[in-house]
């Protein structure tokens, strides 16, 4: 029974876009707290220095995809959040395939 519960929990967590900061992390923590109600969570504001690191700004994505020359939408972030590298910078424009390949990771 516990194996199926863990699997169902993982399926619930999978579609949430998580980074090291942001709404996805907060949503994930709330789901975890359903199973660990005594979990203590501390928040640290953006810009806080932590040893040799600074807490970054939240990274929020509304949508991301690639359109083929025929207009077909591929690599759609709404279908799989792994289609976008975390902390990617916004881009809106047309580039050729060779230039696109310089920005793809497989």
Annotate each predicted stretch with a short phrase.
Residues 1-106:
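N-terminal hydrophobic/helix-forming segments and targeting peptides
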